[in-house]
Amino acid sequence: MKHFTGERRKARELAVQVLFHLEFSDNDPLEAFRLIGENFEMAESMTDFSKALVRGVCDQKSKLDKVISRSSKHWRLERMARLDRSILRLATYEMMFLKDIPPRVSLDEAVEIGKRFGGEDSSRYINGVLDNIYNTLDSQRDEETFSTTEHNSEGTKEPNNIGKVNMKYNPLELEPRWQTHWEKTGIFKAKEDPSKEKYYLLEMFPYPSGKIHIGHVRNYTIGDVVARYKKMCGKNVLHPMGWDAFGMPAENAAIENNTHPARWTYENIAAMKTQLKRMGFSYDWDRELATCDPEYYRWEQLVFIEMYEKGLAYRKKTHVNWCEKCQTVLANEQVEDGCCWRHPELEVTKKEMNSWFLKITDYADDMLEYCEKLPGWPDRVMTMQKNWIGKSHGAAIQFPMVGAGDAIEVFTTRQDTLYGATFMCLAPEHPMVNEIIEGLSQEKAVLDFVNRTLKMDSITRTADFTAKEGVFTGRHCLNPVTREEIPIFVANFVLFDYGTGAIMAVPTHDQRDFEFAKKYDLKLRVVIKPEDSDLNEADLTEAYLDRGILVNSGPFDGQGNLEALDSIADYLETNGIGHKTVNYRIRDWGISRQRYWGTPIPMIHCDDCGIVPVKKEDLPVVLPLDLELRSNGGSPLPFDPTFTETTCPKCSGQARRETDTMDTFVESSWYFDRYACPDYNEGPLDAERVDYWLPVDQYIGGIEHAILHLLYSRFYTRVLKDLGHIKIKEPFTNLLTQGMVCKATQQCPEHGYLYPKEVVEDRCSRCDAHVTVGNIVKMSKSKKNVVDPQELIDRYGADTVRMFCLFASPPDKDLEWSEQGVDGSYRFLQRVWRLVVDHLEELKKVKAWNEKRDFVDPLKSVHRKTHETIKKVTSDVENRFHFNTAISAVMELVNETNHFLNGEGKKDALAWSVVRKSVETTVILLSPVVPHITDELWQMMGHVGSLLNVPWPDYNEDALKTEKKLVILQVNGKVRSRIEVAASSSEMEIEALALADEKVQRHVKGKAIKRVIVVQKKLVNVVV
C-alpha cells in the first residue's frame, strides 16, 4: 500500500473534513461522510480507506483524546482550533492503530494537511504536538507498555504483534563504560605540539561545595562541546579543570559541620570530581590543581614579594569595607548595592584599619585602552569595566582655608561652574575633618555625624532615596576665583573613594547640591543661563542642568559653558590655583582578609626594621592545619604563637608574622596560567609552555564576574608580564558569559517555598494546601526551585542532561528549566538510537556515500539535507555557539532520513550508502553534544575508537544546489496554495505561475487584482 500518494492524501483530507463537520453537528459519521464526500472524486478503495479512518477515530475518540492531552502539559484539546483537533485525532489514530503505516508518514501527512487547510501556523502547531505524541508512543513501544488491539489500514482488527527492539538504549550502562574507555586511553590529555595549532578552552573553575548544580552542568557542557568540536577540527586542545578552594564558604561550612576546612574542601573536591567525570566532560585531569595546595600558593607568595619590591604592593591605614558576618574586609568590587556580595541581607560598614593593597590603578589606562582591543568580549562586560575604571578628565583646584595656610583640593569635571561654588562638602572619611574641627564648638556634633555616617555603606549614602544630610564644621575656605568665603560642611553623600573626597558645591547647576542648599539655607549663584533667557536665583525651583552661556563668571562671561572648560583650566594653571588632571573611579585593590582559610601574606613585622618580606627560599609560608576555628568567624592565626612568632629576615631579631590572608580573587587571577605547567617547580610559570598555550582562546563564565575576577585577571596578567613571567598582556581572547538557569517557584501558604519533590499534584505534601506557582527566576536554594543534576543523570543519563542544557536556549541567554524539555531530549536520543539499530544490518553492508553524483528525489533530498546540515551545524558552532539551532538542524536531518526510510523510494545499495552517509553525519555532528551514545553508535556501525579522533565533516557545495524551490501563494495575505518553480525562475515568471495556479484563480475569480507582491522569490501575495 502506498502511504502518501496523491489519492491517499485526498482520502485523508476528506476524513479530516468529515471529522471537522462532526465537531459542529450531531450527524451520524456516515451521513456526514455522504454530505461532504460529494465534492471529492476518488477511487472506491480510497473512499473506503477514508470511511475506515473516520469510523476508527470516532470509535477510539476517548482514547485518542487521552493520549493527545497526556503528551504534554502545554496544550489542552478544548483550547485547540477544531480543525487542528480533527487533524491531530486522525494522525494519532493512524500512529496508534494502523501498524502497516509508518508513524512518521502519518505525522508528515498531518503536517501537510494542516499546511493546506490552516496555513503555516497550523502546520507548525500540529508538527509540535504530533512530534511529542510520536515520541511518547515510541517510548511506550520500546518498553512494551503499549498493548491493545490494533487495526490495519483497511479498517480490520488484528492482534498486537509489537516485539522488543533488538538493542535497547541504556545510557546508565553505556555511559560509564565509555568514560572508563576514555580515561584508560588518555584521549583528553594535552601535550605541547608546535606543529599543531593550539586551542585553549576554559570554563571558570568552581568552588568545591561538594555538589555540582545545574548551572555548573550548563556552563561546563557549553565548554565541552567547543573543546570536542575544536579537537575534531584538528586543533591541539587544552581543556583543564581545577578548584577555587580557599575562601570563607569553606571556612564557614567547616565551623557549621565541626570539621576542618582542609578536610571539608578535599572531601568535596573528590565528590565533585566524580560528578564531573560522570558527565563525560573532556578534561585533562593530569593538570588538576587546587588553590589551597601549598605547591600552588607558594608561587603566589613569591609574586606578591616581587610586587612589593616593585612598589606594586603596599600596606596603609584606611577606612575599609567591613562585613560583620564575614568578620573581614571587602574590596569595593565585593560590595553590591551596599551589601556584602556573599551576604546580600547584611549592610557593609566602614572600619579604619591597616590593610594590604595592590596597585591596580597603575594599570588603569592600559586596561581601559585594551577594552577597545578585545572584540571577542561582550560589549556589556567591556562597558561595565570601562565604567568601573571610570576615567574622567577635569581639573584639580585649590580652595585656601580661611585663617590657615592649608588648602583643600577638589577634583571636578565641571570647572565651568567654579564661579558658582558657594559652599564646600567633605567626605566623613576625609583626613582634614578632624584637623579643621579641633577645638571648635561644632567638634562633637561633627564627630557624631561622622560616626553615624560611617555605619552606612557607600551605595546607601549616595542613593536617591537617602536624605542628603550634612553638618557645618564651623570653618570656611575661599572660592579661588571669586575670593568669596564659603562654608565647609561634612556631608553623607560625599565619598572619599572618588576624586579627593571633597566637592565644590554649585547648587544652581547640580540638583543634589540644590536640595542641600535649600535644606541648609545656603547661597545660590547662577553662572550658566539659556541662550535666549535669563535665570534668577530667587525663582529657581530646581537646578539648571542644560548647557548654555556663562554669566557671573568674570572674564569668561558670554562664552558657551562647555567651550570654556579648557580656557578656565588654563586660567587656573596660569594663576597657580589649579591644573588639568585625570581622575579614576577605580581604587587600588585591597586584598587583606582577616580570615583563616586563605593564602598567608608572606610579610614579617619587625619593631626595628619595619615590614620585611619573607626570604624567597623560605617559601611557602604554609597555612597551619592544626588550629581550631573560632565560632565568631574571626581568624585563629593572630592567636597562634607557633605561627606568629618568628625572626626578622634582616636583623634576626624577634618579629611577628603577618596574619592577614589574601583575597581569594588573587588565586583565581592566574590559575589559568598555571594550568599550562602545573608540575613546574622552578618558579611560578614555565615560560616555554605558557608561551605555547596562552592566552586562553575561549573563556566561559558568568557576567557577575565582570568587575571582579575578570578585571583582576587582566591586571594580574599585566603584572606577571612586567615581572618577566609571561609575554602576554591579555589573558582571554574570547569571552562567553552564559545565561542563568531559571525555574518557576512553588509556594505553600503555610510552608513557604517548596522543593519540587515536596509538591504532589499541585498540592503541598506536608499540609495538602494548594501550591501557587510563582515567577520564573534564577534557580537558588533559598527559593527551592533547584534541580539536582545527579537525579537527572540517574534517570536519563548524562547525554540527555547535556543535550537539554544546550537545546533549550542559546548559551548567552537564560535557560528556562522544563521537565518536558528533558523528556523530549531523551526521546530524541532514543530516535537516533533506533535510526541506527533498526537498520544496522543494511547499514553495515555499505560504505557511506562520499562521491559526487546527481540523484533524483526522494534520495536527492536526503543527500542534500545531509550536506545542508553539515554546513548549518558547522556555522552555528564555529561562529555563534548557537548549539540550540545546530541540534535543531540535526533533528531535521533525522526526520528527513526517517521519511525516506518509511517511504516508497527504492532501497538498493546506492540508497543505503546515501542513508549511511546521513546516519554517520548525524552521529558525528551530535558527538560533541552527546559523546557517549554517539561513540556507541559509531562502534556499532563497524568503526573503531572514539569520534573525538574523527575529523569534522566537510560539506559538498554541489550537493546544496537545488533545481526547484517552493513558493507559497497567498491571496490577501492568506495561504491558498504552494507551487514548485525552477530555482532560476525570475520574479516575473513566478508571478505568472502564481496567477495561473488553479487554487489562486478560484479565490480571485470575479475580483479585480490590485497588485501582485513577490517576496524574495519565496512568497507571492495577490491583493484583490
Language model feature labels by segment:
Residues 121, 244, 309-324, 497, ...:
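Helix-rich, typically C-terminal accessory recognition domains appended to large enzymatic cores
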Residues 169, 392-396, 529-532, 538-570, ...:
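Long, charged, mostly alpha-helical binding arms that flank functional sites
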Residues 168, 177, 181-185, 256-416, ...:
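Residue patterns forming the tRNA-binding/recognition surfaces of aminoacyl-tRNA synthetases
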Residues 223, 236, 430-531, 536-538, ...:
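Catalytic alpha/beta core of large soluble enzyme barrels
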Residues 158-196, 427-430, 439-444, 523-534, ...:
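Basic, alpha-helical terminal appendages of large translation-related enzymes
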Residues 158-211, 367, 383-392, 577-580, ...:
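Non-catalytic terminal extensions that flank enzyme cores
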Residues 193-259, 288-303, 412-413, 480-516, ...:
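N-terminal catalytic cores of NTP/NDP-binding nucleotidyl/phosphoryl-transfer enzymes
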Residues 1-161:
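N-terminal interaction/assembly modules
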